[in-house]
Amino acid sequence: MAPKKKGKKGKAKGTPIVDGLAPEDMSKEQVEEHVSRIREELDREREERNYFQLERDKIHTFWEITRRQLEEKKAELRNKDREMEEAEERHQVEIKVYKQKVKHLLYEHQNNLTEMKAEGTVVMKLAQKEHRIQESVLRKDMRALKVELKEQELASEVVVKNLRLKHTEEITRMRNDFERQVREIEAKYDKKMKMLRDELDLRRKTELHEVEERKNGQIHTLMQRHEEAFTDIKNYYNDITLNNLALINSLKEQMEDMRKKEDHLEREMAEVSGQNKRLADPLQKAREEMSEMQKQLANYERDKQILLCTKARLKVREKELKDLQWEHEVLEQRFTKVQQERDELYRKFTAAIQEVQQKTGFKNLVLERKLQALSAAVEKKEVQFNEVLAASNLDPAALTLVSRKLEDVLESKNSTIKDLQYELAQVCKAHNDLLRTYEAKLLAFGIPLDNVGFKPLETAVIGQTLGQGPAGLVGTPT
């Protein structure tokens, strides 16, 4: 159509020249050849026009498909948002359920502590009552021994008065032997009493040292684990954030380059369309330009596809970044809550340890005072016994009788010490049974023992196996 317009303008201005000749100077064959050549060019132009129309239809179809896919992806994104909201609601419901469970656990734990305190008070009252009874029995025994010693003194005085003149040498020899035996017995029982006192002191110090070591080790391990977990989480999310930011920046730069290329190609397409409308150059130049435009069009399609893929990847990365940021905030909240729970449990654990240490120290102090009182009583009895023997100069039969009574008194004191050790074993057993009940309650509510944050302290007496059997089965320590 453009050449025809130029032909009309040529007629108005002057006679056109074809192949260097005017139309009136051309022969019929030349005119027919020129007409056939023009028709061939017209056919080729029509074919090229049809080809470009087909390409335009393909591009439009591809654009429609891409638009539908975009709408589908938007619908999927909306569905995902709804699913995320539903998941968040479910998560809030689960959090409420877990909070309710924790409240129930705290309530039961408080009830157990109250029961323990009540049981401890009852046990302490019973122990005090038994101690009073034992004290009264010991006092009665002491009065009986005093009466017997008084009677023996009177009898010994009569015997000594009757035998003093006849057996002076024999009494002197017996006195020397008896003094030697008394010194041996005194040394033996002093050694036993010192060993017993040292052993009890060593047990008490060792037990307190072990309790402090276990407590410090547990606290140090717990704090180190929390610090390592927090450092790992912080480094992990910092790396993810930096990588995502770098990737987003690179994708934005790629999008900017693609957008520039697209604008450049659109301008070139506009220029090419204008050139196609103003076709006046030779056919060879048009073919070369057409091949160049086909290459540019292919590059444009490829760049456009890359741009679409890049946009899709950018959206995915942005969504992943938002999800990671949301997860990071949730984890930070959970970590803060766990830290608060850890601090609360640590405070309760420290208070419980201090209370146990105070009770143990009080019991050890009471036992030490009782042991000191018994030791003083034994020493006093031995002094009185030595004075009686030194004043009475008994015969071997009377000496044997007095020694037997002294052994009976010592056996009674040892029995009292064993009873006190048995009471201590019962208290340790009750404490360990309470720990077992606490662990069973935690497992019943689905809380792992590792999540408690500390290891419960089991009480035991050094050298004895206590708190290991069923409840109530506590043997007398040996």
Swiss-Prot record:
Residues 1-12 have a biased composition (Basic residues). Pfam families: GAS. Residues 1-33 are annotated as: Disordered. GO terms for molecular function: microtubule binding; small GTPase binding. GO terms for cellular component: axoneme; ciliary basal body; cilium; cytosol; extracellular region; Golgi apparatus; intracellular membrane-bounded organelle; microtubule. Changing A391V: In CILD33; the same mutation in the mouse sequence shows a moderate decrease in cilia motility. It is linked to Ciliary dyskinesia, primary, 33: A form of primary ciliary dyskinesia, a disorder characterized by abnormalities of motile cilia. Respiratory infections leading to chronic inflammation and bronchiectasis are recurrent, due to defects in the respiratory cilia. CILD33 inheritance is autosomal recessive. This is Dynein regulatory complex subunit 4. The lineage of its organism: Eukaryota, Metazoa, Chordata, Craniata, Vertebrata.
